From Swiss-Prot:
Listed GO biological process terms: cell division; cell wall organization; peptidoglycan biosynthetic process; regulation of cell shape
Gene3D superfamilies: 3.30.465.10, UDP-N-acetylenolpyruvoylglucosamine reductase, C-terminal domain, Uridine Diphospho-n-acetylenolpyruvylglucosamine Reductase, domain 2
Necessary cofactors: FAD
Domain FAD-binding PCMH-type: 23-188
Record organism: Streptococcus pyogenes serotype M49 (strain NZ131)
Stretch forming the signal peptide: none
Classification via SUPFAM superfamilies: FAD-binding/transporter-associated domain-like (SSF56176), Uridine diphospho-N-Acetylenolpyruvylglucosamine reductase, MurB, C-terminal domain (SSF56194)
Positions annotated as active site in the UniProt record: R167, S217 (proton donor), E287
Reactions it catalyzes: UDP-N-acetyl-alpha-D-muramate + NADP(+) = UDP-N-acetyl-3-O-(1-carboxyvinyl)-alpha-D-glucosamine + NADPH + H(+)
Disulfide bonds: none
Enzyme class: oxidoreductase
Highest rank taxon of the organism: Bacteria
Protein's name in the database: UDP-N-acetylenolpyruvoylglucosamine reductase
Pathway: Cell wall biogenesis; peptidoglycan biosynthesis
Length: 295
């Protein structure tokens, strides 16, 4: 118990595999669940004062946490999940579930968020990664975000300053943490929006191994190619290291089929990169983030 942070939900030596989509990850020294910006500021101020590292884990969907875990504070925004509408502008806190947020937009007959209807993760992580699918991405509807800087200051960042690119945003370099974000939507027809979301979710269910733990799409799309196609052509579908294998359903995914570890994921990623490069001459670049310490 840290007496200076009394009243905040903080768990010591907490295994992170219970919170990640991959079902891997060692312990966090301290795992914190702030309920509001005040509690978040208290955690960051304490960590900075004590020279303790801290990071925000988000919804841990496109992420691998190593088996040795993470030192210092890991902050999760599960309780910072409010969503508000002001006309055609939707504002969501960083911990809001991305899929549920698209359903709120649909309920109010607002169009623009359909592309994200099946993307797992949080609003904060989606902004960080400029998440996208089926021709849409966060940058297409993003207005601004409130962020927390490493020094504990809260500031607003515009779409221009975010410098979005393919699975990229400026905050990947600055280390700023999204607290909330605003999105510009447009009035639409409820039935049309609903039909499009159903169509995209059907495609996702057909093509992706949603029945297994995974980190989502492992590799960025190489120019002029598709990562899954290159992996398939290198005869890597079903290739397994430890408890993790390249999905038979979609070669761009790696799934945890038998109590796999983060090391299994990393070893399989490295093997796929090397094998694909030897086969096609194309070097794949991981989209998934890998953080933490090895055992």
């Amino acid at each position: 118990m840290i007496t200076e942070l009394h009243g905040i939900d903080i768990r010591e030596n907490e295994p992170l595999k219970h919170y990640t989509y991959t079902k891997v990850g060692g312990p966090a020294d301290f795992l914190a669940f702030p309920r509001n910006r005040y509690e978040l500021s208290r955690i960051v101020a304490y960590a900075n004062k004590e020279n303790m590292p801290w990071l925000v884990l988000g919804n841990a969907s496109n992420l691998i946490v190593r088996d040795g875990g993470i030192r210092g504070f890991v902050i999760m925004f599960d309780k910072l999940n409010a969503v508000h509408l002001n006309g055609y502008t939707l504002e969501a806190e960083a911990g809001a579930n991305l899929i549920e947020t698209t359903k709120i937009a649909k309920f109010h007959s607002l169009t623009g968020f359909e592309f994200a209807c099946g993307i797992p993760g949080s609003i904060g992580g989606a902004v960080f990664m400029n998440a996208g699918a089926y021709g849409g991405e966060i940058s297409h509807i993003f207005l601004s975000a409130k962020v927390l800087t490493s020094s504990g200051e809260i500031k607003t960042i515009s779409a221009r300053d975010m410098a979005f690119g393919y699975r990229h945003s400026a905050i990947q370099e600055t280390g700023d943490i999204v607290i909330s974000a605003k999105f510009a939507l447009k009035p639409g027809n409820y039935d049309t929006i609903s039909q499009e979301m159903n169509r995209l979710n059907h495609l996702r269910q057909l093509k992706q191994p949603l029945e297994f733990p995974s980190c989502g799409s492992v590799f960025k799309r190489p120019p002029g190619h598709f990562a899954g196609q290159l992996i398939m052509e290198a005869n890597l579908k079903g290739h397994r290291i430890g408890g993790v294998e390249v999905s038979e359903k979609h070669a761009g995914f790696m799934i945890n089929v038998a109590d796999g570890t983060a090391k299994d994921y990393e070893d399989l990623i490295a093997y796929v990169i090397e094998t694909v490069e030897n086969h096609s001459g194309v070097r794949l670049e991981p989209e998934v983030r890998i953080i933490g310490e090895n055992l």
